[in-house]
């Protein structure tokens, strides 16, 4: 039987996930969005012809029968929908960041655990083919101990009106660079402390632009490893870039992105290189994993607890930056 799905948020991300859901064999039964035009566009782009429309989330939750909910809302629009659905036993896929503060995130984790639901957070980079290969090497012990992580996120865009306002999106670290902070955790380990800086250097004359457009952090991990992650919104217009490098005792891996990387093995007399290149759709992979876990009753590889831990990481970066770079402990 096809997994029945409801989608909350009919924007670009919601429509993209909708198409991948249908490609994976799920049945979309309902879509909820405050915009009638967005709901209509969502329905027009789906193959399913009997998708119910809702303006009110509570009404959709009350009237529709579905197993899984996709929450594809901007950070500011998330207002307890996760907890309401969890208490009804709905399995939930939620985009990052899961919340704008860790206290809310902690409540979400608690509610999910108390109600035994399956969750998945949209950190799609974990599903990249090059990332998967490195993770396998880590788990086999072939990389040796982790040493250092470098990450760089760059773009130059005003995106959408809500994105440029820090009270609505949390800032670039929260809304975009969090992908690299999550990747750092995934490949290196859990951070102990961080020192962060951030500023707005390129958009001082842009109306309502209150998010940082440049940031940098240095982190220390429980296993002794370190990380340096930078982000900015001042580089090349039309190009979004998230590159990173992971250094281990026996291998160094340079990632152009999550699907493309060069592995240099240093545990031999002459270093050897191996290139991994793939055009696989990491978004599709995370959607399929979520559906499979619902069908099999198993937890996903990136559940709400993982989303909370990465939220704690970026919150500590911002807290440090707001205190002029004072070393700040990362919550557990």
Please state what every model-predicted region is.
Residues 105-124, 144-151:
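Rossmann-fold dehydrogenase core element
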Residues 94, 119-121, 150, 229, ...:
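Hydrophobic residues in well-ordered beta-strands that form the structural core
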Residues 1, 22, 26, 48, ...:
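C-terminal helix-rich "cap/oligomerization" subdomain common to oxidoreductases
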Residues 1-48:
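N-terminal Rossmann-like dinucleotide-binding module
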Residues 125-208, 324:
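Predominantly a Rossmann-like dinucleotide-binding segment in NAD(P)-dependent oxidoreductases
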Residues 175, 182-260, 287-298:
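Contiguous beta-strand/loop segments that form the cofactor/metal-binding neighborhood of enzyme cores
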Residues 124, 221, 234, 241-312, ...:
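C-terminal glycine/acidic-rich active-site capping loop/insertion
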Residues 17, 49-111:
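Beta-loop-alpha module in the N-terminal Rossmann-like domain of NAD(P)-dependent dehydrogenases
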């Amino acid at each position: 039987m096809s997994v029945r799905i409801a989608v909350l948020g009919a924007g670009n991300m919601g429509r993209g996930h909708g198409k991948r859901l249908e490609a994976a064999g799920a049945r979309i039964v309902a879509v909820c969005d405050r915009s009638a035009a967005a709901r209509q566009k969502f329905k027009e782009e789906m193959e399913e012809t009997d998708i119910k429309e809702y303006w009110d989330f509570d009404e959709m939750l009350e009237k529709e029968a579905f197993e899984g909910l996709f929450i594809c809302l901007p950070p500011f629009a998330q207002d307890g929908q996760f907890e309401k659905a969890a208490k009804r036993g709905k399995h939930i896929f939620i985009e990052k960041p899961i919340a704008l503060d860790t206290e809310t995130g902690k409540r979400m984790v608690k509610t999910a655990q108390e109600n035994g639901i399956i969750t998945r957070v949209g950190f799609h980079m974990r599903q990249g083919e090059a990332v998967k290969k490195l993770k396998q090497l880590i788990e086999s012990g072939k990389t040796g101990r982790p040493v250092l992580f470098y990450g760089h996120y760059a773009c130059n865009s005003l995106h959408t009106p809500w994105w440029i306002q820090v009270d609505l999106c949390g800032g670039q670290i929260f809304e975009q660079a969090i992908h690299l902070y999550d990747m750092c955790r995934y490949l290196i380990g859990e951070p102990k402390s961080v020192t962060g800086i951030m500023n707005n250097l390129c958009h001082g004359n842009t109306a309502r632009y209150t998010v940082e457009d440049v940031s940098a952090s240095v982190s220390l991990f429980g296993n002794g490893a370190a990380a340096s992650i930078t982000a900015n919104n001042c580089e090349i217009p039309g190009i979004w870039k998230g590159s990173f490098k992971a250094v281990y005792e026996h291998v160094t891996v340079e990632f152009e992105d999550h699907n493309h990387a060069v592995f240099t093995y240093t545990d031999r007399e002459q270093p050897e290189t191996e290139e991994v290149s793939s055009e696989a759709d990491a978004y599709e992979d995370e959607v399929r994993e979520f559906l499979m876990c619902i069908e099999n009753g198993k937890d996903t590889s990136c559940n709400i607890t993982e989303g909370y831990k990465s939220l704690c990481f970026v919150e500590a970066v911002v807290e440090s930056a707001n205190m002029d770079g004072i070393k700040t402990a990362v919550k557990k």
